């Protein structure tokens, strides 16, 4: 028999009854039932119940074992009595009668519990992550993550893509976030950067003629922590293809990712045909370029119904500024919600005020004496005819309600989108048991930066502008669209991509609009710029955020619940104690000196 085990703790079945076996694992818990000891023995694969009674030669030692000790047990497989069968366990029809126990390792008093998985301070969990990872839910999440990545790899290989690895030590590249810099010992005063994405390398692979590339790529961004992003390091399914249009990218990746979702969705419906929604339409209908399509609320403009109306706040705004619009957030009642009345409207208004807004106008409709009429301050101010016209446009009736936002849409659309989401959550309209996918397409190429008072790239600076050189020379830059697209699932951006700009001339023109000269382009993107002068094929691709995809599929509440050794929200690795000061010797070798930041008065 093997030194440590003949079977795993998930392997034994009723067909093994009578066999003498050997198991090794962690003591999950110990129970004493009237002098008979029950030990749940756990390993990576599952749990087996071990029994030791006073007649067992292993009983004396069994009495000493404690939770999370590592032990080896030899014993005989026995069938459980019918009334003690546990159908929730893979090994629930059998138990192991202990004959010999060997203690392989003892455990100190635990800093956090493994059994039962109660809530525990996150910093303790991260400091003792090796114990935290023994918890069933987290352990399953990590195993599921591995399976999902494996499924992605298989899917890409079946589509004829080859996996190539690109450098981790590279040049600094302005891609929207700060770089992590690595000082060079050999080249004093110079620095490598960890890649924010393999963007330039994968494009260079297309120029080199490799046609279909993918990689499970680690990416590094020195960003301030956010709830929907892991600080420091994250992973993406990085993809690039030659001689393709954006439609080719969509029709290649959409079925593959749908298949991955269906494989791990545990029966929840997954969108089979992902709708293509133009960016402008997404902003108008959902107030977001990451719309949660499980929410049935679709916004509409109702400006005409408030122009010259009795509601002077909106009417005066419309008269004073041609950019002003009034958007409606219509909410239809369901059997589950019942009629939507003043109480819901008041809660929504209070929520809006809590976010710093002056409030949220509303109308709710009810039936009185056989007639449907609008109620609330807005309905009273604009009158019966305009209220009825709004209801007719939006398809609203008795029991329904509508919220209103007014101003310059460029300034209020995000709040309108948040109000749409809040209304959907308030009335429980969002179906949590499905995965709703879409592509957001036709992104703006440029945007106006209020902070810097200049034009900047809206997204990926390497995207191909729609219309090419001709559009560049004839259009207002802020009206240019890019061959750029995002994939969205349940309100989360899960992928971003574009058709790339492979023209050196157009590349220089694109960067000139944001204030970078040809010399700047050659200095910052020299490798790519040079490559494009030696025959670059039309190419494009995308990158799916693996961490977010896994988080959605396992239903985790944050990204740290699907990552092995994540940093905390202060970008610290509490387990390894990183970041940490360098030693004087290390600093001397790198010709570096730490200069403390002056303290502010």
Curated annotation (Swiss-Prot):
GO terms for biological process: aspartyl-tRNA aminoacylation. The record marks 33 as: Important for tRNA non-discrimination. It catalyses: tRNA(Asx) + L-aspartate + ATP = L-aspartyl-tRNA(Asx) + AMP + diphosphate. It is an enzyme of class 6 (ligase). It is found in: Cytoplasm. Residues 199-202 are annotated as: Aspartate. Signal peptide: none annotated. GO terms for molecular function: aspartate-tRNA ligase activity; aspartate-tRNA(Asn) ligase activity; ATP binding; nucleic acid binding. Its EC number is 6.1.1.23. The keyword Nucleotide-binding applies. It holds the Pfam family GAD. ATP binds at residues 221-223, 493, 545-548. L-aspartate binds at residues 175, 221, 459, 500. One of its GO terms (cellular component) is cytoplasm. Keywords: Aminoacyl-tRNA synthetase, ATP-binding, Cytoplasm, Ligase, Nucleotide-binding, Protein biosynthesis. Aspartyl-tRNA synthetase with relaxed tRNA specificity since it is able to aspartylate not only its cognate tRNA(Asp) but also tRNA(Asn). Reaction proceeds in two steps: L-aspartate is first activated by ATP to form Asp-AMP and then transferred to the acceptor end of tRNA(Asp/Asn). Homodimer. Belongs to the class-II aminoacyl-tRNA synthetase family. Type 1 subfamily. This is Aspartate--tRNA(Asp/Asn) ligase. It comes from Allorhizobium ampelinum (strain ATCC BAA-846 / DSM 112012 / S4) (Agrobacterium vitis (strain S4)). The gene is aspS.
